[in-house]
Amino acid sequence: MEVTFFGTSAGLPTKERNTQSIALNLEPYSNSIWLFDVGEGTQHQILRHSIKLGKIDHIFITHMHGDHIFGLPGLLTSRSFQGGENKPLTIIGPKGIQNYIETSLQLSESHLNYPITYIEINQQLAYHHNGFTVQAEMLNHGIPSFGYRIEAPIMPGTINVEALRGIGLEPGPKYQEVKLQETFEYKGLIYNSDDFKGKAKPGPIISIFGDTKPCENEYELAKNSDLMIHEATYIEGDKKLANNYHHSHIDDVFNLIKQANVNKSLITHISNRYNIDEVTSIYNELSLDQTSPHFYFVKDFDTFKI
């Protein structure tokens, strides 16, 4: 799996950073892409990447502020002509997301050639799809804003080729049966698949947060995450000011990383008041502090393996 950032700015785009959008590539579990938020200009950012709109089969919206949704109507209509024909799409988000999309399409007389399933969240959500579990919880942003916890399926153990050759089974289609099933039959005998592969590995846990100031639900979403993606609109200055505007200060994020035992954290939604050089300078300063946890300030088009 890997995650790509198509927008890392907060509120407004800058010359260097677009508004919010994150793509989660589900390979090797599937060839699908899940998109989290679709700020203005997202489809233009995607044109500069190898991701195809037709591979996006889920869109998760954290909240209804414009820097997270203004790119939706254009992206949805373009998907009709870029590999999305007859490919179902699921859109999950706060109440109002369906009305926003359908009103935009109706008033612009836009017509899609694929079906959309809408799931609107009230307070929380437990969603299951192809072995993935997605948990959504309400955050604290002044309007309904959600964080998402994605738990990937268990990865089957690696095939022990030499052990299978030991019973006369050479590499071929049968190996997929060994990998995915508890038992397999070969030459009239039934074998336990676990005897011919390594231990299964738990899938990674990824937590992706919408805009928020510190709140209790953050911990539940972030705990023991292999990767956490969190906003830090304010990467310096007065923490009270950040919280007054229902946003997080970098110190808030650091506290969450430590309390929730997060392995790796990527910081996005950095205020548009900072240019790239200023972001880099503040990052370098924070990195020198021995008490800082493992973190990184992301830039547009950054991609990270999970």
From Swiss-Prot:
EC numbers on record = 3.1.26.11
Pfam families from the entry?
Lactamase_B_2 (PF12706)
Q: What class of enzyme is it?
A: hydrolase
Gene designation: rnz
Signal peptide feature range: none
Q: Give the top-rank taxon of the lineage listed in the UniProt record for this protein.
A: Bacteria
Could you tell me what reaction this enzyme catalyses? Endonucleolytic cleavage of RNA, removing extra 3' nucleotides from tRNA precursor, generating 3' termini of tRNAs. A 3'-hydroxy group is left at the tRNA terminus and a 5'-phosphoryl group is left at the trailer molecule
The keyword Repressor belongs to this UniProt entry's keyword annotation: no
- InterPro entries of this UniProt entry? Metallo-B-lactamas, RibonucZ/Hydroxyglut_hydro, RNase_Z/BN
Question: What Gene Ontology molecular function terms does this protein carry?
Answer: 3'-tRNA processing endoribonuclease activity; zinc ion binding
User: Briefly, what is this protein's role?
Assistant: Zinc phosphodiesterase, which displays some tRNA 3'-processing endonuclease activity. Probably involved in tRNA maturation, by removing a 3'-trailer from precursor tRNA.
Q: Do you know which NCBIfam families this protein is assigned to?
A: PRK00055.1-3 (NF000801), RNase_Z (TIGR02651)
Gene3D superfamilies registered for this protein in UniProt: Ribonuclease Z/Hydroxyacylglutathione hydrolase-like
Name the needed cofactors.
Answer: Zn(2+)
- Put simply, this protein is called Ribonuclease Z
Where Zn(2+) 2 binds, per the record, is at D67, H68, D211, H269
Q: Where does Zn(2+) 1 bind?
A: H63, H65, H141, D211
Q: How does it assemble?
A: Homodimer.
What CDD domains does the annotation carry? RNaseZ_ZiPD-like_MBL-fold (cd07717)
As to how many cofactors bind and how, the note says: Binds 2 Zn(2+) ions.
Key words of the record = Endonuclease, Hydrolase, Metal-binding, Nuclease, tRNA processing, Zinc
Q: Which residues form the active site?
A: D67 (proton acceptor)
Q: Which family does it belong to?
A: Belongs to the RNase Z family.
Q: SUPFAM superfamilies from the entry?
A: Metallo-hydrolase/oxidoreductase (SSF56281)
